[in-house]
Every structure is written in C-alpha cells, then in structure tokens.
Amino acid sequence: MIHSHSPTVIPFSISQTPLQPVFNGAAFLSPSAPVFDIRKIAGMTDLLIGTGELGKALSASLGENAVVLLRGHGNAVVGETLQQVVYRAIQTELNARLQLQAMMLDGPLIYMAPEEAAKVNARSGPDATQIGRTWELWKERSRRQ
C-alpha cells in the first residue's frame, strides 16, 4: 500500500466529481475511486487513520478497488507488487491532472467505459509488460538524477 497527499487527487476527495479513468494507464480506477469520509465513521477527527477500527473501515471502503480517496487528506493505493502499486500511485496522480485539465474544456468528458477498462485490466496484472517497462524507465531516470 502507498499512502500519499497527492495535490491533484485531493480535490476529488472533497467534491462531488468522481475520479474516473480518462486514459488506459489508469484503467484500474474504473468505474471510479471510492471516497472514504472518516467523519461518517468517527465524527469530527484530525482526518488521520489512527486506530485499528478506522483502518478496518478504510479497508472496507477500498473493497475490490485499487485506490481509495481519503476526504480532505489524500489517497491510498494497493497492488500485488511494489512495481504495480508504485505504477498505480503515479498513474492516479497523472489521471487526476488529466481529468482536471479536461474538465476545463468545453463539453462533457468521455471517460473510459467499464468494458474498455476491463480489457485493459485483463492484461495489466502485477507482471504486465507495461508495468515492467515503466518501472525500468523510472529506475534508469532515478540513477541519472
């Protein structure tokens, strides 16, 4: 699991606009990332998951999804391997950025259909070539910096 305070994702946790996949690299978001609102479980808090009970509630909110948004706090991303969870965390941020940019354009957005996302996800398991190639690229970039 990766937890982040992704600045482009947080607005989706506090609005009525769901974070939905807008490109194939974020098909795992389909149909949309659920929002965990700690206030509904524990009332007024500091928004931190500080007890086992809150952790269980967050896990239940995640369900079978790869990403859950934490209202006013950030997001949590899961995967079967380190490479997959890092890929998903980065693609979640990128998808949020793209979705926000598209929302500024005129007209309705065309999100990935659940059927399209299912086809992408069927070939995007933890050992997928796309994830492996992207991981190797990121490793090489980090060596150069």
Feature map (PLM): residue ranges:
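Glycine-rich flexible loops
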Residues: 1-145
